[in-house]
Amino acid sequence: DTIFRIYSMTKPITSVALMQLFEQGLFQLADPVGKFLPEFKNPKVFVSGSYPHFMTRPADREISIRDLLTHTAGLTYGFHYRTNIDHAYRKVWSGPRGDNTDFSFPPLDLENFSQSIASLPLEFSPGDKWNYSVATDICGRLIEVLSGMTLDDYLSKHIFKPLKMKDTGFLSQKI
């Protein structure tokens, strides 16, 4: 009866939800993310510099939905602490007050979070490398746009309730 956060184990749940929409014919895996989230059109790749003054170059191609699902989109997480892009993610992630430095959840709604992440350069061109990242958060935003529902409502209606996962939800006030 213990309630706890499942953190990154939400990634397969989000991926299943997105693939349900794929099965409905709402997108193709090769579709550019920018087709549904305009903020991701014409991505730029980091060359040099530091936040907020980056030198960039155009990415070799657009980010595909497949890239998001396979963590090959060029995105990152702030907690890697490897690059200047990680540092920029920490700035975006911590919010205006800097009060979310444990990376436990995006401080913004998914629409604004997606726009903030898209405003930053990619670490590499889509498809070039694998990097554990916020790609699943962007998949969550895609689910919202494609389904017309918030992510938590979609997961509840199409995953948790059909599987009788009555104690599973998006956020718990009990933690």
Residue ranges and their predicted role:
Residues 1-131:
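Active-site-proximal loop and beta-strand segments within enzyme catalytic domains
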Residues 1, 174-175:
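Short, intrinsically disordered, charge-balanced linker/junction segments flanking boundaries
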Residues 19-24, 137-145:
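Short glycine/serine- and small hydrophobic-enriched flexible loop segments
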